[in-house]
């Protein structure tokens, strides 16, 4: 699909009276959606937003956030979505390098005096910049799990290439409906939005409420395994046909239970820099993350995964300049340890996470996969702690779905002795920050405080 106009305007021409969006209890067809976006875009234009303006959008997923995002894009703006939970000092360090002029904070106040505050206002008109697929449109902060986040900058065509690749694997028809279940300040949330726009299907955006209620009428969702477990265990009445799972090891029991209820489960491997998913497959309990999707290339160099793709970011934004992602050979070196077998990629773990205990290398992700296979485990992280005799020893930080269980016996015949955690700690609520990734650095610091 090649668009010659804004995707929502394209679908207005093709199927204007078909439902495009469900916003809480309101339904908008493509014609009504375009009218709403036109008024919002005209409102932003009156406030000074022009092509190339940098706008920070600090908001949770709400119907208003989604419509504002589309309107800012239609103005030709470069949107930086920000997690409202990010601390002020971090943003004060980050924002000056990102060449922003405006801040839109729909449910709060702008705490950055250097940025002009934008307000949601509807103005009669149909303001729109010219559709240019190669225009820079989004700046997405990387997870920052090992340092200060960077802003990866994507074009429209990169986001659409990402969507096209995923939808070559996951059927998403005209009358299917994908819940915007992940935050738009993460690239995985943006991926849902762009798949909806690419397919011309339906999307649902609801204010925060129990997942089962949010899923009412939805055929597709992007979830973490914990969420799907809870839906299945509670025998929730859902209309799901397909789920894209991410964020953790995926037990085969989970996908088999889902299949029995008519839900196909997909999983894969993605990065902020590549506008979400790079490799994917229908979940089968095997360790690989699937084959590269169309438009993506993968190769292994010295055990490291290298990538290039049509969905790749143009670069990292720094003081008005784009800093290239690629190395001298034109590839993005991920710092992920990986292996390719029969065209399928297996991620062993982060090169940066490898540590040594008594001379033996421990890759945390390998140990985590073994422990995560226990049915009581929702999440597990292996953290190195300094040890005078061994250099480092592994500590497990756990989230369980019920009362804590003793896993130290369970792992004895499944992990080498040096891999077995010397302590088992429960993941504290303060580290579950509403993001998709939990910072390993924050975990290390917390574990050190427990010593």
UniProtKB/Swiss-Prot annotation:
Q: Which GO terms describe its molecular function?
A: ATP binding; identical protein binding; o-succinylbenzoate-CoA ligase activity
Q: What class of enzyme is it?
A: ligase
Domain of life assignment: Bacteria
Which InterPro entries does the record cross-reference, listed alphabetically? AMP-bd_C, AMP-bd_C_sf, AMP-binding_CS, AMP-dep_synth/lig_dom, ANL_N_sf, ATP-dep_AMP-bd_enzyme, MenE
E.C. number:
6.2.1.26
Task: Give the UniProt keywords, A-Z.
Answer: ATP-binding, Ligase, Menaquinone biosynthesis, Nucleotide-binding
Which GO biological-process labels does this protein carry? menaquinone biosynthetic process
Query: What pathway annotation does it carry?
Result: Quinol/quinone metabolism; 1,4-dihydroxy-2-naphthoate biosynthesis; 1,4-dihydroxy-2-naphthoate from chorismate: step 5/7; Quinol/quinone metabolism; menaquinone biosynthesis
Disulfide cross-links: none
The catalytic activity, as recorded, is: 2-succinylbenzoate + ATP + CoA = 2-succinylbenzoyl-CoA + AMP + diphosphate
One GO cellular component this record assigns the protein to is: protein-containing complex
Family according to the record: Belongs to the ATP-dependent AMP-binding enzyme family. MenE subfamily.
Functional description taken from the UniProt entry: Converts 2-succinylbenzoate (OSB) to 2-succinylbenzoyl-CoA (OSB-CoA).
Protein name per UniProt: 2-succinylbenzoate--CoA ligase
Upper classification of the organism: Bacteria, Pseudomonadati, Pseudomonadota, Gammaproteobacteria, Enterobacterales
């Amino acid at each position: 699909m090649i668009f010659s106009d804004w995707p929502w305007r394209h679908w207005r021409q093709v199927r204007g009276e078909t439902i495009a969006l469900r916003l809480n209890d309101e339904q908008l067809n493509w014609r009504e959606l375009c009218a709403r976006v036109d008024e919002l875009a005209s409102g932003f234009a009156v406030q000074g937003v022009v092509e190339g303006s940098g706008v920070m959008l600090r908001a949770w997923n709400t119907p208003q956030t989604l419509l504002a995002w589309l309107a800012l894009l239609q103005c030709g703006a470069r949107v930086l979505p920000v997690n409202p939970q990010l601390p002020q000092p971090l943003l004060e360090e980050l924002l000056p390098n990102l060449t922003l002029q405006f801040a839109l904070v729909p449910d709060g106040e702008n705490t950055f005096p250097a940025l002009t505050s934008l307000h949601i206002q509807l103005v009669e008109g149909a303001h729109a910049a010219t559709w240019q697929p190669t225009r820079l449109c989004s700046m997405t902060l990387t997870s920052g799990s090992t340092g200060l986040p960077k802003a990866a900058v994507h074009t429209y065509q990169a986001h659409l290439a990402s969507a096209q690749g995923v939808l070559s694997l996951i059927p998403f028809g005209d009358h299917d409906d994908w819940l915007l279940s992940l935050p738009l300040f993460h690239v995985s949330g943006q991926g849902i939005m762009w798949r909806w726009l690419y397919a011309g299907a339906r999307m649902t955006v609801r204010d925060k409420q129990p997942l089962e209620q949010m899923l009412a009428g939805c055929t597709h969702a992007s979830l973490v395994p914990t969420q799907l477990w809870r839906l299945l265990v509670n025998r929730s009445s859902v209309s799901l046909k397909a789920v894209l799972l991410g964020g953790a090891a995926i037990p085969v029991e989970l996908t088999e239970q889902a299949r029995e209820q008519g839900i196909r489960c997909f999983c894969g491997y993605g990065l902020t820099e590549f506008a979400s998913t790079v490799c994917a497959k229908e979940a089968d309990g095997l360790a690989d993350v699937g084959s590269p999707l169309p438009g993506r290339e993968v190769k292994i160099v010295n055990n490291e995964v290298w990538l290039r793709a049509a969905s790749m970011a143009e670069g990292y934004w720094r003081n008005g300049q784009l800093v290239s992602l690629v190395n001298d050979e034109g590839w993005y070196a991920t710092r992920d340890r990986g292996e390719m077998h029969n065209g399928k990629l297996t991620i062993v773990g982060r090169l940066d996470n490898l540590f040594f205990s008594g001379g033996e290398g421990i890759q945390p992700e390998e140990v985590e996969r073994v422990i995560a296979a226990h049915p009581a485990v929702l999440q597990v992280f292996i953290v190195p702690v300094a040890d005078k005799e061994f250099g480092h020893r592994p500590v497990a930080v756990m989230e369980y779905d019920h009362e804590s269980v003793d896993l130290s016996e369970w792992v004895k015949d499944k992990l080498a002795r040096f891999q077995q955690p010397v302590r088992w700690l429960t993941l504290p609520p303060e580290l579950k920050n509403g993001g998709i990734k939990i910072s390993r650095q924050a975990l290390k610091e917390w574990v050190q405080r427990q010593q």
